[in-house]
Amino acid sequence: MALLLSVTNYMKALLYIFILSSSLPLMAQTPLLPFASSREVSKKVSTPDSQDVRYIPLFGSKKMVEEQLLNATEFLTQCDKSFKDRSDASNFFADRGWEYLNDGLLDTATYRFNLCYLLNHENVEAFWGLGSISYQKGNYEESTKLLRQGLILSPENTTLMIDVATVQLACYKEKRNCDDIDDALRLLEKSLQIDPSNANGWLKFSIAEFQLEHYDRAWDYLHKCRQIDVSFIDTTYLQELISKKEDPLGLFK
């Protein structure tokens, strides 16, 4: 058994070398609304866009995916030897993608999520990860599209619903061409109907109502967040809300 594990780890190490790619120079990242995902998206750095198809979400097009499959015979063979099946291999590369994303290596993370997708077109993590990267890069329209593709695969995923709504709120704030903010409200409402104990969901619901200048509702939802987990309250947002209307309960000054 120990020998089998050793061989498996060795094969995975070889696989790592096979798909290893160099990192590009780093640049500063603008602070964003945090996602609901338990995986922390990096606030440190990001990498510039690359024209290499490996660093374009889903390799850029269906045609490019088909070309990648034709050219990836050795990679797929190594995966078949190293993992119990391709779904397992896909999950492996998804995990690596989240690790690189947390380290701020966005292009490297993109390639890992692309490999995740190449191995399993129905792995929600591929769309979730690539959508998170697009959000980090400020490509909100692309992020919304990718996250929604993930939501099609996992329609009752409340955390993913909140992440889609988070992108839409950021998009709405910058007056970009995204889905209507009413859709963000609908997603938040649905997620909280399924899981009313989600403090981050109530926080995002509060922010949505704040952007619509519904300050009473914003306070109501913020206090629901506070009652569940006060640590989720964003102090910057709290001060913005106070500047528009004082706390009706008098708890925050």
What is each stretch, according to the model?
Residues L32-F35, F75, D88, A199-K253:
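Terminal, low-structured helical/coil segments at or just beyond the last alpha-helical repeat
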Residues E99, V124-N200:
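Alpha-helical adaptor scaffolds
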Residues M1-L33:
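Bacterial Sec-dependent N-terminal signal peptides
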Residues Q29-N102:
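N-terminal leader/linker segments that initiate helical-solenoid repeat arrays
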